[in-house]
Structure formats: structure tokens, C-alpha cells
Amino acid sequence: KFLLAIAVLSSLYSSSQSTLKMDFETYNPPSTLVVPGKPVLKAKYPFIDVHNHQFGMPTMDLGTLITDMDKMNMKVMVNLSGESGETLKKSMANVKANYPNRFIVFANIDFKNVGESGWGEKAAAQLEEDVKNGANGLKIYKSLGFSVKDINGKRVTVDDPRLDDIWKKAGELKIPVLIHTADPKPFWQPMDANNERWLELATRPGR
């Protein structure tokens, strides 16, 4: 009987312990830190959203977007994803035809073929053309310095001199340049139990 009682208790303990186990990715408790008040859904004063990504702007119904902007009192949206060439021209045509005073569009650089003869001059010329077509700035994505490689397979750094023509042209055009760079150090370390960003890297591998 004594041994049976021990076996039963051991079984109950093991069962209770198993119910306490949970995958780290599953653990997401609601916060108990609750403050009085209600969510602010509309800004008191008109504001400018300086960081937005609207990839479908060439063909999207801007009226729907404007409705959402008006609900929160957003006066102007800066779309950092204007791309380049014909795509940017179509975005600007859509904006000018419908809401010319509500959007600012930034161009982007196509970093394919870095290292080819004359690549920098061509990229700078395309940027100038994009500005003529309505772009108000240049947005550089985190891929530069992270995944962009030249024609020889070598990673292209942000301070690569082959990009100097682009920065020079941006200065001549007097347009702002926004660069997303310097990812956290753990992004470059082994993805194991010692990486403090493991959960982020596991659940969002494309970051």
C-alpha cells in the first residue's frame, strides 16, 4: 500500500508538472498593467506620418486610405516605398489625380548589378529622373549592408565608395535620405539558446 501511494503521488506530480510546460513561442500573457482611460483614436492636432509603406500606391484606391487617415487626423502620409521608374510615375499620377496635397513619396534604389561599369552613374541618373517625376526623398532599406551583394557576390556596405554617386546626386537635388541600417548585434550571432533575440528571429525570420 505504501509503495502504491508513492506511485500515485509520483504520477500526480508528473502530471501536474507536464501541464506547467509550455513552448516559449506560446507564452504571451496579457499585461496586468492597466491604467485608467481610453485609447486615443484621433490626434488632437493634424500630424504627418513620416514612416509608412504603401507598395500598392500605383493602382490602389487612395480614397479608402484617406478615410483612415482622416479618422486619426493624419494630414500627410510619407510613403517610403515609391520604388523607381515607371512604378513611381504611376504612384505620382495616382496621387496628383486624386489627393495631391496628402502624400509625399520617396524613391528607392535598385541595387542589382552593383559593380558593373557605370552602375553608380546610372543609379544617380535614375534618382534624378525619379525626383523630376515627383519623388521628394530617397529611402534606403535595411537590405543595404545586410543582404545586398555586388556582381562578385561580395556584401555591399553602406559606406561603399561605389555608392558615392547616389549620395552626391541626392545632395545636388537637396532631397533627404533615410537609411535603415545597423541591425542588432544578435542578428549576426548563432541562432541558439544564447541568442537574446532568438524568439524574434524564430518567429520573424525575414527581419
Model-derived segments and spans:
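Bacterial N-terminal signal peptides
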Residues: 3-11
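Active-site gating/metal-coordination segments in enzymes
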Residues: 18-19, 38, 88-207
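An N-terminally biased module of ancient metal coordination in phosphate/nucleic-acid-related enzymes
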Residues: 17-101
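Residue-level detector of alpha-helix boundary/anchor positions
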Residues: 8, 40-42, 171
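Sec/Tat signal peptide C-region and signal peptidase I cleavage site
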Residues: 12-16
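A generic structural motif
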Residues: 6, 79-82, 105-110
